[in-house]
């Protein structure tokens, strides 16, 4: 214990101060190059170090390398994002909050999160092959409206990078667990991209098809297929077209299609919490069951941009839409825990969005020492969401929200090194709830017929930040921001016990986020950064279990913690780094004291990540990554020794990944090994859920060979 504390103290001292990319972005990149990262998710294009916020940027090179280890986006984000838990090794990302609260997931600014009824699939809405880079802004924010009480994750799709009429690349990948069971563990991926430009027109077309093998743990046992990622086939198509009317104006169209469904011969078996894992065995599914997964996720936008539309003012307008249909696992009727009027069934979520954004950015020069950018505009979003069963019954009826929001954001630069940010957004949301009957659990339960109506939400959110960048060795920032969320409204309505909408607790969650941090560069060999944060909400968003079902805990909550990072260039061809993130969440009880903890669903154990990036010779790379998550033991079992869901003990995890590659002219060859040491362990999610059926292990050693040919 003393050695562990000493090591942690040394890391905190040397790292001293924010976000960190677990894997080196490029072994020959210098800290100066890393500093010049421009982000756009804050709605004002700016350097990451000037954003007065903790920002993680995962660039295209890093995505290309990490996706060989983690082709599933939720897995990739869990490995490289401080403040986020490791992935669950399932299709669900429920336990992957951002700093203990829900994040708003965007694809090119199009919301993927479904606040009217959460899918917990927000991070599995696009394939990594279509992604150029990812911008993660941490802390509560209302820059894009409802849902970002933990932060924003904006996934930016690829675009043409060629100056020829036709260029392209073909990628083939194969993976295997075959050290254990031949014929069952193989997977493959194929990606084809074509891109180029001719005259004023540029384009990119990308298509991906992949299939994973059966998931196998470190002992060679098939992992339970419940919500599993094994035996899934994935399809993704991205089309992007751009036309430049002039050097200053451009029209761009994007369309992305994503599908991921499970097709397995395995069925779940066994599972005893903290005793034996839930496994997969070959068997026959219930004939009523259909393939689980995301049948489709369509996203599209049409965007017009104009620089200097009028004096010193840029303009951007976009129309966008999305359509999602995802199906959950089949649940056989269980007399001990009945649902859906004591019948079997399979629920799904259907979600549609249409919206537009208009934004003006004006540049002001007030004096030789003072300049400013003023961003102002208007957002509109129409969102329809329902949770039907595949047999046609509705668990949650179609809810329709209408969201209008004017906003303004000002960033002033004083003496070129003092940056002041101030902004506000006023959201007007009307949710139309139809008359509906609550789908009872038991036939003998009283039928509740809810009289529908309109739920109205008006919310004003502010943000203010200050950053100081005169000295590279110490670039501090301080920030305050607010966010709000209509947190999983459908979950509340489907369990309604009152017949009048006004009697049902549907208040939104509002958060205040305070943060202080700094970026630092020492010479051209050392980067340090870090932040400390505190978030408070009068109404909570943590989930708790009541009568076998999840409900929202509305008691006040606070989350506080820190992120620390250090990157060091040891030699020109050798780089290393480490990152630690830790935070805690408390609930204010009826006693008026903060003497209860938020569940493990929201608050993960501390996470430490370290890497070494080595370039043996030119055009090669060797990356070794180590991940450690700590223990979280905050809750006691009941008299029978049973934990509430979400309150199970989370034990430590140690994980090592290897990534190596070589470039030979037009070829890029790679070898990746996830779980290099073939560690047999349970996922954090399986431990915290504390339920037999979900007590499943993580994947064992998996080897992937990748070949990319560019032309």
What is each of the regions a protein language model found here?
Residues 215, 484, 576, 618, ...:
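C-terminal beta-signal and adjacent terminal beta-strands/loops
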Residues 128-167, 710:
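A beta-strand signature from Gram-negative outer-membrane beta-barrel systems
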Residues 312-333, 467-487, 505-560, 565-569, ...:
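Membrane-embedded beta-barrel scaffold of Gram-negative outer-membrane proteins
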Residues 74-114:
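Extracytoplasmic beta-strand/coil segments of soluble accessory domains associated
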